Amino acid sequence: MKIHEYQGKQILKKFGVTVPRGIHCTTVEDAVKAAETLGGKVWVVKAQIHAGGRGKGGGVKVATSLEKVREYAGQILGMQLVTHQTGPEGQKVRHLLIEEGADIKHEYYVAALTDRATQSVAIMASYEGGMDIEEVAHKTPEKIVKVFVNPLVGLTDEQALTLAKGMGMNEASIPQCIETLKSLYTCYMETDASLAEINPLIHEGDGTVKALDAKFNFDSNALYRQPEIVAMRDLDEEDPDEVEASQFDLAYISLDGNIGCLVNGAGLAMATMDTIKLFGAEPANFLDVGGGATTEKVTEAFKIMLKNPKVKGILVNIFGGIMKCDTIAEGVVAAAKLTHLSVPLVVRMKGTNEDLGKKILKDSGLPIISADSMAEAATKIVAAVK
């Protein structure tokens, strides 16, 4: 789960990280009032969407007058903001953050994240802030310093000092930087985040260390114990089909292809998508119905897939372990009838009650194409949609 920058800064502030004063707005008039309330001579008008690269896309503007605040707020609110993370369609801007200006002397990068390679929490820092860390890692990896944290001990002063010096932090700002890094780690752990990123972290002319941006990803499996985080969820920022799928406990992700996929198990789902691509087509989605699929879940899965006008065919690939093939077959038949299925449907199933499942499909009277292997299934659905 993701949240907006202004929400992320609220969380950081709660854990002791210094952030600029800012006010969340949803209208142009509120933006102007926010600037008046903040005072000063410089304000930053920032689009709030769940994507990075907002500045390059025109979603972050520095205003030096209230008239400019009004102008920029009017330009940004309601725009389709396109960044390298949104795709070509962009995301509609519904929220703004009006923030006081900062006396930036240098921009750094810091993040706490789950490092899958070492199965531990890593704290990363770099002198090269304010830009894509992936680009820094690719071109100048020596500019990134990383430490791994023992969760029984936490981020130590020694580790935080190593990070602060390794990232080239201004000498006078190192003590506050150490506290900021320790607060970031505590925040990451206590909110069940999988990523807590500040890019940029700055030091000002007087040495103050501030977080000028905040990006969080949270572990969806831990949200049951994070009600305050759940309350920050903005469904307008999420794919409506993915939101609907989550209500039926379906793991669904929209893609750009034309072959819908319904599979049980994430690994098999990824292998199915790879096989479709191998045979020259593109999957329209990732869809894992899990091990406890019911007729209702399968029907909803079909409905969600068929909402996508790009879907020209559906491939169902099931391994019957806990999930029995006959249960899936009954769900597929019911779903095909309820949705008045009009695109080719290929079903491949192996495992528990496989023969019974195939009989249910055959006796349904529906034009369902059967396959015995994943390669055969992919071949048949690719041929059917051409």
Curated annotation (Swiss-Prot):
GO terms for cellular component: cytosol; succinate-CoA ligase complex. Keywords: ATP-binding, Ligase, Magnesium, Metal-binding, Nucleotide-binding, Tricarboxylic acid cycle. Substrate binds at residues 264, 321-323. Residues 9-244 form the ATP-grasp domain. One of its GO terms (biological process) is tricarboxylic acid cycle. InterPro entries: ATP-grasp (IPR011761), ATP-grasp_succ-CoA_synth-type (IPR013650), ATP_grasp_subdomain_1 (IPR013815), Succ-CoA_synthase_bsu_CS (IPR017866), SUCC_ACL_C (IPR005811), Succ_CoA_ligase-like_bsu (IPR005809), Succinyl-CoA_synth-like (IPR016102). ATP binds at residues 46, 53-55, 99, 102, 107. Mg(2+) binds at residues 199, 213. Pfam families: ATP-grasp_2, Ligase_CoA. Its cofactor is Mg(2+). GO terms for molecular function: ATP binding; magnesium ion binding; succinate-CoA ligase (ADP-forming) activity; succinate-CoA ligase (GDP-forming) activity. Pathway: Carbohydrate metabolism; tricarboxylic acid cycle; succinate from succinyl-CoA (ligase route): step 1/1. It catalyses: succinate + ATP + CoA = succinyl-CoA + ADP + phosphate; GTP + succinate + CoA = succinyl-CoA + GDP + phosphate. Binds 1 Mg(2+) ion per subunit. Its EC number is 6.2.1.5. Belongs to the succinate/malate CoA ligase beta subunit family. PANTHER family: SUCCINATE--COA LIGASE [GDP-FORMING] SUBUNIT BETA, MITOCHONDRIAL, SUCCINYL-COA SYNTHETASE BETA CHAIN. Heterotetramer of two alpha and two beta subunits. Succinyl-CoA synthetase functions in the citric acid cycle (TCA), coupling the hydrolysis of succinyl-CoA to the synthesis of either ATP or GTP and thus represents the only step of substrate-level phosphorylation in the TCA. The beta subunit provides nucleotide specificity of the enzyme and binds the substrate succinate, while the binding sites for coenzyme A and phosphate are found in the alpha subunit. This is Succinate--CoA ligase [ADP-forming] subunit beta. It comes from Dechloromonas aromatica (strain RCB). The gene is sucC.
